[in-house]
Amino acid sequence: MSAYIAMKGVITNVDENIRNDEDVAFEYEIQKTPQNILTWKRYIEYWKEEGRTDKQIRWLYERFCSQFVTDTSIWEDYIRWESTKEVVETSRIFWLFQRCLKSCVRDCDRICLSYLELAIEQYDLAMIRHALASSLMKMEREMHRKVWDPVIKFVEEKVLPLTQLDSTQEDEEESTDEAELINVLLVKGFTKGGFISEEISENGSRGDIWSSHILERYLKVAPQQKRNESLATLALTRDNITIKSVYEKYLPQDENSGKYLPSSELPFELNFNYLASLEKLGLDNQYEEFMRQMNGIYPDKWLFLILSLAKYYISRGRLDSCGDLLKKSLQQTLRYSDFDRIYNFYLLFEQECSQFILGKLKENDSKFFNQKDWTEKLQAHMATFESLINLYDIYLNDVALRQDSNLVETWMKRVSLQKSAAEKCNVYSEAILKIDPRKVGTPGSFGRLWCSYGDLYWRSNAISTARELWTQSLKVPYPYIEDLEEIYLNWADRELDKEGVERAFSILEDALHVPTNPEILLEKYKNGHRKIPAQTVLFNSLRIWSKYIDYLEAYCPKDANSSDKIFNKTKMAYNTVIDLRLITPAMAENFALFLQNHYEVMESFQVYEKTIPLFPPEIQYELWIEYLEVATSHQLSSLSPEHIRFLFEKALKNLCSNGIDCKTIFIAYSVFEERISGLISKSIEILRRGAVIGTVSVSTHLESRLQLWRMCISKAESTLGPSVTRELYQECIQILPNSKAVEFVIKFSDFESSIGETIRAREILAYGAKLLPPSRNTELWDSFEIFELKHGDKETYKDMLKMKKVLESNMLIDSASVSHEEGNINFVAAATSHAPNSHTLTQSTSSYSINPDEIELDI
């Protein structure tokens, strides 16, 4: 009946629409078989082909739909035809969709989705809601996702962006920079407080109510994985009433008070959205309680929440609460980045408050402002601003101490930031209470802090207080001995300046008392992993022993002897250091020198004997040099020659076996023998010993050995004659590397020439020529040429040139082993011995095997 009424103005009588026999035939057939859909479709197609009017075709479609009112395919065909007209009547299409959905109960999925799609295309919010409701009612639950997805997409992509573009004061608060934001919040807060009559734009609407209702409905059926995303989208609608009511469905409630609490199951952002809705709705008590709960649940968001709460206080005109919050936060922050953010916001807040109040005071609006009260507020904000700037370093130091209160350097920095002595004392006192000595990382730093604390009183002439402090400091269980060293040494220096040396001695002697079993205590301390106090091993402090000995030596009389108290204390201190194996090379030298200066030379020798074995070979060498120098000094030493020889031999045995270059000792030993016994041969033999030591490795201390060979041969030439000199030359040349032996070959040849042995000299040069290729042996060939020009003739000169040419063409570049080849030509025997004092050396070169190919020249 309703369909008939609706089409009353459209449908005319049959006579107006039936024009020809074909129409009559179709009418007859549909009257005969009205349920034959095919006949109806052919009838409509015929009219469309005939070009009947829209009004006529619509009349026939209405009859068709009335006959098959529950068939959605016919309604779809009708709607499709209406949609293809040149002028589409959207309202008529919506009307058809609604009639169809009202009539049909099954197979409505395509109709529903098409209806919804058209509504979304037309941005018709009312139709979208109707299409959504109809679709959800007609379609199976499993298909609802296909209904919701385009609607939610439309809300997110088309509707909400328009909501965000709506310019309100809320947008202004979110988009401006921080200084402008604070100013906006100040205006808002002062206006709400009734202090100013500033007009602010208030958004009277509830935001995007249409979207919020859609999303509220969607959240009831949304899948779990879409819930959080949808809640976040809901917050964008700014319909705070709906936001609050919907969010509360997902928040837990306090059993006693019934207040809603943050949910740990929801992300932080969603909890904060609820918090923001409470603020927008002016629910201050609920806002502050919820904020307090969020601070407990989200400690990692502490900074963000603090600044949000600060802005909230400003927007409510509660400037004192904001200042207190920021000040408290500065004293709690643990990270420099958080400190920097809060400090800058606090500074900006005080600056903007001062400028804002100053501007209003200049307007002189007595209706709203009490000049006196607000002048005082202005002064308070300006004072806070100035204080923030002045105390920046202190606040920064606070952060460092909160991070690690056991960092002594930070406390010392804090002391330096204080101006008065009283303030410095307070910092020292606080540091001593808060620092755990077992957690101090830098050895000696805590002890230096105690020293500085006491020095503060000492410089103020409060001597007894300083002493009490240092006495107390010695009871602290330091894990590092360096802390006690700092205190004792500093205290001793102060007492030395104030009371004299006896008081300083007493302080250090108290530290250096050696227990009965020091080794056991040292072992326990070493294995204690910083759990055993350093006081147990303080006696092992080299720094304190050094300072103590320095004091003793400085105040020991120059003419002191064994009857002098300080002299005996000095000796005892040195000996204790040796017993504890703390002695250093410098201390050993100083001890020996100290005894020598006080005429106890023999006792100084005992110092060398005891200390030398304590050091590595390199240090032993230096001490042996000093020891032997004093031992061989006839002004100081009374040792017998046999004892001195024993010392030389002992030194050489210990040092040479460890690869130490003992050239200096060999030379000193040689000089000593020549001076004491007058035996030149023995002196030369000592030099030879030094030169041949280490022949297993020809490069060992090579330069020192070369120098010893030069001294040895030079002395032999001048004192022992040709026979011994030849033996030394021969041994030297055979031991040394070829490149170094050439020097001695030339000297050997010159020596033979000087005593008239020219043939031997020529053979020696010929031998040396074979040691190296001519290109690397220029010095020898130059000498060879000079020799032939002076002592040879034309034939010998030619022979020399011929030899050089042969060697240049045949000799291998590497001839390092030529002197050691089997059958190598040895030196020719001398015709006569011209040395009346030709002695055989203690270790003769005859130990070498005789070469059967040795050339003997019968001169």
From Swiss-Prot:
HAT repeats (start-end): 17-49, 52-84, 88-108, 123-157, 177-219, 238-271, 427-459, 461-482, 520-554, 599-633, 639-675, 685-718, 720-754, 756-790
Summary of subunit composition and partner proteins: Belongs to the NTC complex (or PRP19-associated complex), composed of at least CEF1, CLF1, ISY1, NTC20, SNT309, SYF1, SYF2, and PRP19.
Any one annotated GO CC term: nucleus
SMART domains in the record: HAT
Family of this protein: Belongs to the crooked-neck family.
Protein's gene: SYF1
Keyword line: mRNA processing, mRNA splicing, Nucleus, Repeat, Spliceosome
Disulphide-bonded residues: none
Source organism superkingdom: Eukaryota
InterPro entries according to UniProt: HAT, HAT_Syf1-like_N, HAT_Syf1_central, HAT_Syf1_CNRKL1_C, Syf1-like, TPR-like_helical_dom_sf
Protein name: Pre-mRNA-splicing factor SYF1
Note in the entry: Present with 2170 molecules/cell in log phase SD medium.
Pfam families: HAT_Syf1_CNRKL1_C, HAT_Syf1_CNRKL1_N, HAT_Syf1_M
Signal peptide coordinates: none
Cell compartment(s), UniProt: Nucleus
Entry-linked Gene3D superfamilies: Tetratricopeptide repeat domain
GO biological process: generation of catalytic spliceosome for first transesterification step; mRNA splicing, via spliceosome
Function: Involved in pre-mRNA splicing and cell cycle control. As a component of the NTC complex (or PRP19-associated complex), associates to the spliceosome to mediate conformational rearrangement or to stabilize the structure of the spliceosome after U4 snRNA dissociation, which leads to spliceosome maturation.
